[in-house]
């Protein structure tokens, strides 16, 4: 019964997140098209660079949110309202201090804007305006939005989607209209970010009327919950590794190229981020369920669910990456024009990187559920390898060199180390089980690609005259691959069939 409830909540969260995902995805691509048409690639590249600079300052967040989330699972399971209030109060106290660090750091950073954006052909105030709006939006998460962590940890993330995402959709629509019809859309952007934050804060208060944060007790609570402070310190190093992976690349690319190349890279990254967001919408709602499962302590059930989730996520990852490689260039041509297409090697490097990033999520979800953040050398090593190789290889091969540096660091730390750490420290299983599981799934994925192209030999091919017809043919190939892969995953007895039976059992129980 508990398992069915956990699964039911996960499905509800996923369905709501998916609905908002598809609406938001359309608006994102349309708004980017409006940006390019009315503001140009230079301003778009500026916005990407300003975002990355702010993300650097957000390293000060130290991973407090993740530390709080894994600490909340047990009191939420036991309905311990006193502990919940104290933990969220400690989070608010820590976030207030982080907010002031971000403010001071931003002021110092803005003093160097004349040198950072020396090559920019736009007026310097554009950089200050872009960064300022992004800064205010970020500060709202420290002063107002931090309480949403309770909704996520309690598997009620759909309430965040209802209120916050709806406000974000309205914000994006107004931003598009402002850019098209007004001289400056930044004011609209800022106003709706504030409104969305206030709506979310009200939703949390209505859902948890007992939730009363007392920030004045912060220092006292930090002594009462030393495990949280310890996890925060450990997570700081993991944040560094994550930042080096996701946020330094555009800055290094800009150092070796131009804002226009950053914009081209940003177009492709928008497609990839769309895929990552889709996977997040489908699977992240299950993370709180994993935390709840770990809190119960049933080792056999924990391992069984791991195998199911690994299989399902691997299936989706293969489909997504196949589609990205097949369809992205054609989509970019249809979306913004042929001049924004990058070479095949760049796309291949981005696709392989995406494959590793998406496949890591099952291991990461379990690491977060266990609060297993003690391997602080791993993110430091990852960040060092990433930055050093990106700078070195970027010097010789430009954009592709930077991407290769990212890929190598991911392979060594995320692909090789993280599964070993989880299986040894938490699951208490031999790594051999994971390796066999991975090899089986990867072999099926490769065989499915071979079968797909074998079938295509019997399908008449034409020299397509338009990008649209080529795109439609690419969609057909992707669907064919999906059907073959899905059939093989199900009938070969991988974890997918157990997951499907679990869903069927839950649905039958509702009838």
Residue ranges and their predicted role:
Residues 1-2, 427-430, 452-511:
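Membrane-proximal transmembrane or re-entrant/amphipathic helices at the cytosolic face
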Residues 36-38, 42-43, 158, 169-201, ...:
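Membrane-interface helix-loop junctions in multi-pass transport and translocation proteins
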Residues 6-74, 103-109, 137, 171-172, ...:
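Signature of the first transmembrane helix
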Residues 95-248, 352, 381, 454:
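Hydrophobic transmembrane helix module of multi-pass membrane transport proteins
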């Amino acid at each position: 019964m508990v398992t069915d409830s956990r699964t039911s909540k996960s499905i509800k969260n996923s369905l709501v997140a998916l609905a908002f995902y598809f609406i938001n995805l359309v608006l994102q691509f349309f708004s980017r098209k409006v940006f390019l048409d009315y503001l140009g690639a230079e301003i778009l590249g500026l916005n990407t660079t300003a975002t990355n600079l702010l993300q650097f300052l957000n390293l000060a967040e130290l991973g407090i949110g993740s530390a709080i989330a894994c600490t909340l699972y047990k009191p939420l399971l036991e309905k311990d309202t006193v502990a919940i209030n104290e933990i969220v109060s400690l989070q608010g106290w820590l976030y207030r201090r982080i907010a002031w660090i971000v403010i001071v750091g931003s002021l110092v950073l803005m003093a160097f804007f004349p040198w950072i954006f020396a090559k920019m052909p736009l007026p310097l105030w554009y950089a200050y305006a872009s960064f300022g709006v992004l800064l205010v939006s970020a500060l709202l998460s420290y002063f107002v939005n931090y309480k949403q962590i309770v909704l996520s940890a309690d598997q009620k993330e759909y309430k965040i989607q209802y209120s916050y995402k709806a406000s974000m959709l309205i914000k994006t629509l107004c931003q598009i209209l402002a850019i098209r019809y007004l001289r400056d859309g930044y004011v609209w952007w800022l106003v709706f970010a504030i409104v969305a934050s206030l709506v979310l804060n009200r939703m949390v208060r209505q859902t948890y009327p007992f939730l009363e944060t007392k920030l004045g007790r912060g220092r006292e609570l930090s002594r009462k919950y030393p495990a949280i402070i310890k996890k925060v310190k450990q997570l700081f190093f993991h944040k560094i590794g994550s930042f080096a992976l996701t946020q330094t690349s555009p800055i290094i690319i800009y150092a070796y190229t131009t804002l226009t190349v950053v914009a081209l890279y940003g177009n492709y990254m928008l497609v990839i981020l769309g895929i990552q967001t889709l996977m997040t919408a489908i699977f992240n709602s299950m993370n709180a369920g994993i935390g709840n499962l770990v809190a119960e302590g049933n080792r056999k059930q924990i391992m069984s669910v791991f195998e199911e989730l690994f299989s399902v996520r691997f299936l989706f990852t293969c489909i997504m990456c196949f589609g990205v490689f097949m369809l992205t260039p054609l989509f970019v041509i249809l979306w913004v024009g042929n001049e924004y297409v990058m070479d095949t090697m760049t796309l291949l490097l981005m696709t392989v990187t995406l494959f590793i990033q998406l496949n890591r999520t099952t291991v990461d979800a379990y690491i977060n559920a266990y609060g297993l953040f003690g391997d602080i050398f791993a993110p430091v090593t990852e960040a060092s390898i990433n930055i050093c190789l990106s700078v070195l290889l970027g010097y010789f091969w430009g954009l592709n060199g930077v991407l290769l540096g990212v890929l190598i660091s991911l392979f060594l730390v995320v692909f090789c180390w993280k599964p070993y750490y989880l299986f040894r420290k938490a699951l208490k299983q031999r790594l051999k089980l994971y390796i066999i599981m991975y090899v089986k799934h990867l072999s099926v994925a490769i065989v499915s690609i071979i079968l797909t192209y074998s079938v295509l030999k019997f399908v008449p091919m034409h020299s397509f005259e338009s990008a649209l017809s080529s795109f439609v043919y690419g969609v057909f190939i992707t669907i064919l691959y999906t059907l073959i892969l899905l059939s093989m995953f199900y009938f070969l007895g991988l974890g997918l069939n157990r997951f499907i039976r679990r869903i069927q059992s839950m649905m039958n129980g509702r009838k």
